[in-house]
Amino acid sequence: MQKMNIQLKEDQSSKHSFFLLMEEVTLTSVKQAVEWIFEANFSEEPPELMNLIITSPGGDLNAAFALIDTIRGSSIPVRTIGLGQVASAGLMIFIAGHKGHRLLTPNTSILSHQYSWGAFGKEHELFAQVKEFDLTTKRMIAHYKKCTGL
C-alpha cells in the first residue's frame, strides 16, 4: 500500500475511469460498482485504469466479497483509493485493488477487526451457522494473506 497525496489533473485524453463508493457496504452500493467494472470490461473503448475511491464504515461482508471477486476478475487494473475512513468490509474491498495500485490519502483512517456475528435458532441451525462463520473467517484470512503477503 502506498500513502500519498492525490492530484488529479483534467486531461481529456485520459483513459481513466472513476467510481465513488462513499457509503456503507450493501448489496445496493456494490451493485453499482460491479456494474461499473463490467461495463468498462465489455466496452469497445475500455479505460486503461479504473479508480475506485472508497470511504466506508464497513457493512455486509458477503456484498463486499461480490465486489472483491469482480475486482479480481477485471482485465482492467483497478486502483483503490482510500479516502477518509476505510473500515471493516470497506477495508476488505480496498486491499482487493490490484497490486501496486492501492493508495491511502494522508488523513485516511483504516480499521480491521475480528469477524463477528449474532445467531439464533434451533440447535441444528446454530451448528450450521457456526460452520458458516468458520468458513467465512477462513475466506477473510485467505483474502488478507493474498492481498498483503502476510
Where are each of the predicted segments found?
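Terminal-region recognition feature
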Residues: 1-150
